[in-house]
UniProtKB/Swiss-Prot annotation:
Belongs to the GPAT/DAPAT family. It catalyses: sn-glycerol 3-phosphate + an acyl-CoA = a 1-acyl-sn-glycero-3-phosphate + CoA. The gene is plsB. GO terms for molecular function: glycerol-3-phosphate O-acyltransferase activity. This is Glycerol-3-phosphate acyltransferase. A motif (HXXXXD motif) lies at residues 309-314. The keyword Transferase applies. Pathway: Phospholipid metabolism; CDP-diacylglycerol biosynthesis; CDP-diacylglycerol from sn-glycerol 3-phosphate: step 1/3. It comes from Pseudomonas paraeruginosa (strain DSM 24068 / PA7). HAMAP family: Glyc3P_acyltrans. Coiled coil: none annotated.
Length: 834
């Protein structure tokens, strides 16, 4: 501190050196408009110890002709060596800081006024801000180093001076008269505490006004986690199981808490807004948002949990950006620990990310800290965001939800349900996903690589492409209390035990996960790329005459306008030809001209990528496509037969694609679709029978193209059933059947020239087998072998026979019969191992 002459000399040299670079000014000329009584002592108070801040204040005082803070000041008969003090005292020579103590200078000043007869003393709060307000700053680089609420280290302070020092601003506030406070007669100690409190509130309010609100809970929350009863219990158990001291176990828990917790920073949120505004409007052609009023309606008084689908790494930031731009608080976002890397991890953390390990298994202390952190967010009303799919979808389908975060949320709500929790599904649709090229290998069947945000940098070479628009649809909110009332009516009256883990939790969590997935799919944003991909991939060579493609696109649009998938789903503007021109402009279609017109087709690379975009909306068309499938091998079918066979197949389509309608609603919805198909000329109705068009007609071609949207899905179902029936009862385990299905699908794709790697995706077979088990069509014996109900045969010979052409069924049966099941299973296991 420059409290003595030789130190003031050093301080003067430092100030002159600083001002070789720094330029400062007062905010609103506040230094020139102060109303001070120069006959009475004037002291300046700064919030935190900082020599550079003090040098700036001293310079501005000299400019305005005010008493200088580094000069002595007479206080009655005594002399204070300098006319300033810090609200937070300076650290001692060991670097320790007593944040609870008052400044000795303030103590002496108050005593002089209250006890020693000094007429008055004036305290002027002064704040120094390096750089512009985050709301005024447009440079992303400067926003990264802008003033924030975190305690700043020396290195960061130096960087801030170098980067932001040319626009340093100083705010002088109106003086506080100690005489007015002393005359309240509260005594020295209480008055001292009151002055400190007034100054703390003043600095906080001013800082909020200038740099934005303090969004971070980290400084107060992290240590509080260790005091929570469930965490204390886990610490004690860690001491006992690992034979370590209490102090060491607490240190481990604190390390976990620091690893997990986010550290919201308003300047970083503004930094991300500036970067992303450029990104969405330069790389993409903007973001289209629908139904955001649903969030605004439930934001007040509820704990909001955003549950977006996960297509790209930029999903992490997109939702925060949109909410911030629409005046809503950005959420705390669950991110994988793999993203907590130098620089990027820090930006993500200050943008709201909290980090979680991929597995908590075997680490009870980490589990307790993480669960308590989530519970604290929920109970304090901080909005959160996590991806129920776990990882990014490489296939474009809605992945089967992972229930871990949902279970933690449910348990937290059971523990404290005073603040209602509302899940808000958010569907994010890209016309061209940024990581599309990196997904290409995995779509072709390559092993899935570990996720890394550096995947984004691998696509820099492709940034010259047109990426189209991004669509964000907010789905119908799910109120957790209402959900529990439906599925566990007496949940509020039950004794849930100390860990809030009732027996019904797993099953209820699974139901909640399926509800979330269906609500996400309900909010599908159907874009031109989705529709063109759906149409062309339904042809044998991914090619169509331009006029034929326009007709089927017009059909898709007409059907969805007549029978909307859901109130949350959205459609693109324009007719089929307009959609074609749009997709052509994105260089996703190849073209060949001849005397008869143009043929549009997908080249090999785009054909594989197109499966991704088709899968985004396959659930929307699954039911009308299933209805159309009944007319591939049947020229006519009665309504009763169609409904019976559709009811048999629908549960498996619904489970795979998370289709919205329940089995009870199915008949009525099928009637709507039948009416729409009749109106579009794709079917003709005679009494209770539906008849397809003549095979030579355009309408027949459109009907068959619609049917082919789900043909591969139905083929996979039939493969698994054929293999089971061929192997016999109690011959295969679920894993063996899954491997057999994969080998069989690979063989069929080669034999029939299918360029669709997801056709032999193991996970799809795995979930189909699980659905058969859930519906009790299959059972496991004590050794894990599968036995099947007679319904399986009826499914194969009844429903499947009606929806799959005879040549496809014959080909599948021939491959299934080629070798004994044991030999094929051995080969598939070898393939899986290698």
């Amino acid at each position: 501190m420059p409290r003595y002459p030789f130190r003031r000399f050093g301080f003067g040299a430092l100030r002159r050196l600083l001002y070789l670079w720094v330029r400062s000014e007062t905010i609103n000329q506040s230094a020139f408009t102060l109303k001070i009584d120069r006959s009475k002592p004037v002291l300046y108070v700064l919030q935190q110890p900082s020599v550079s801040d003090l040098a700036v204040v001293d310079t501005e005082c000299r400019k305005a002709g005010l008493p200088r803070p580094v000069m002595p000041v007479a206080v009655g008969d005594a002399i204070e060596p300098a006319a300033f003090f810090y609200l937070t005292p300076e650290p001692d020579w060991l670097g320790r800081q007593d944040k609870r103590g008052a400044s000795p200078t303030l103590v002496r000043m108050l005593a002089a006024v209250g006890q020693n007869g000094l007429d008055d003393a004036q305290i002027i709060p002064v704040s120094v801000f390096w750089g512009q307000s985050p709301d005024s700053e447009s440079s992303p680089w400067k926003l990264l180093f802008a003033d924030n609420w975190a305690v700043t280290g020396r290195l960061r302070k130096l960087a801030r001076i170098l980067i932001l020092g040319r626009k340093t601003r100083v705010q002088f506030s109106a003086p506080i008269h100690l005489r007015e406070l002393v005359e309240q007669g509260k005594g020295h100690e209480r008055t001292l505490r009151m002055v400190n409190r007034i100054l703390r509130v003043h600095f906080r309010n001013l800082k909020t006004a200038v740099i934005g609100p303090d969004l971070s809970h980290r400084r107060n929350l992290v240590k509080g986690l260790l005091r929570a009863p469930l965490v204390r219990q886990a610490i004690s158990e860690e001491c006992e199981s690992e034979r370590i001291s209490q102090e060491k176990a607490e240190g481990i828990a604190l390390r976990y808490a620091n690893e997990i917790a986010s550290d919201f920073s308003y300047p970083v949120i503004r930094f991300l807004e500036v970067i992303l505004s450029w990104f969405w409007n330069k790389l993409y052609e903007g973001v289209k948002v629908n139904h955001i009023e649903r969030v605004q309606d439930v934001a007040q008084g509820n704990e909001i949990v955003y549950v977006p689908c996960h297509r790209s790494h930029i999903d992490y930031l997109l939702l925060s950006y949109l909410l911030f731009r629409n005046g809503l608080t950005p959420p705390h976002i669950a991110a994988g620990i793999n993203l907590n890397m130098p620089v990027i991890g820090s930006i993500l953390r200050r943008g709201g990310a909290f980090f979680m390990r991929r597995s908590f298994k075997g680490n009870q202390l980490y589990t307790a800290v993480f669960n308590e952190y989530l519970h604290t967010l929920f109970s304090r009303g901080f909005s959160t965001e996590y991806f129920v799919e776990g990882g990014r979808s490489r296939t474009g389908r809605m992945l089967h939800p992972r229930t871990g975060m949902l279970a933690i949320t449910l348990r937290s709500f059971l523990r404290d349900s005073r603040r209602p929790i509302v899940f808000v599904p958010v569907y994010i649709g890209y016309e061209r996903v940024l990581e599309g090229r990196t997904y290409l290998g995995e779509l072709r069947g390559a092993t899935k690589k570990k996720e890394s945000i550096f995947d984004l940098f691998k696509v820099v070479g492709a940034l010259k492409q047109r990426f189209g628009q991004v669509w964000v649809n907010f789905g119908e909110p799910i109120h957790l209390d209402q959900f529990l009332d439906r599925h566990q009516p007496d949940w509020q009256d039950q004794d849930l035990g100390p860990e809030y883990r009732p027996d019904w939790l797993p099953q209820t969590t699974n139901l909640l996960a399926k509800d979330v997935a269906r609500h996400l799919n309900d909010a599908a944003a159907i874009n031109p790329v989705n529709l063109v991909a759906l149409a062309l991939l339904s042809t044998s060579r991914q090619a169509l005459d331009e006029s034929a493609l326009a007709r089927i696109l017009d059909l898709y649009l007409a059907l969805l306008r007549q029978v909307p998938y859901s109130p949350s789903a959205t459609l693109p503007d324009g007719d089929g030809q307009a959609l074609i021109e749009y997709v052509k402009s994105m260089n996703l279609l190849a073209e060949q001209k001849d005397a008869l017109g143009r043929i549009l087709y997908l080249d090999e690379q785009n054909a594989v990528l197109a499966t991704y975009y088709r899968n985004n909306v396959l659930h929307v068309f699954a039911l009308p496509a299933l209805i159309a499938s009944f007319f591939q091998s049947n020229s006519r079918i009665s309504r009763e037969q169609l409904l019976r066979f559709a009811r048999a197949l629908y549960p498996y389509l619904q489970a795979e694609l998370f289709i919205r309608w329940s089995l009870d609603e199915l008949d009525a919805v099928i009637d709507q679709w039948l009416a729409a198909l009749v109106e579009q000329g794709l079917l003709r109705q005679e009494n209770d029978t539906f008849i397809r068009p003549a095979p030579s007609s355009r309408q027949y071609v459109l009907l068959i193209l619609l049917a082919r949207s789900v043909t591969q899905t139905l083929q996979r179902f039939y493969m698994a059933i054929a293999l089971l029936l061929n192997a016999g009862q109690n011959a295969l385990t679920a894993e063996e059947l899954e491997n057999l299905c994969t080998v069989m699908a690979q063989r069929l794709s080669i034999l029939h020239g299918l360029n669709a790697p997801e056709f032999f995706d193991k996970s799809l077979f795995r979930h189909f087998i699980q659905t058969l088990l859930d519906l009790r069509v299959l059972r496991k014996d004590e050794t894990g072998k599968l036995s099947y109900h007679e319904l399986l045969g009826e499914l194969a010979e009844g429903a499947a026979k009606r929806v799959l052409p005879a040549e496809i069924r014959l080909s599948i049966r021939q491959v299934a019969l080629e070798r004994p099941a044991e030999e094929a299973a051995a080969e598939s296991n070898d393939a899986a191992t290698n």
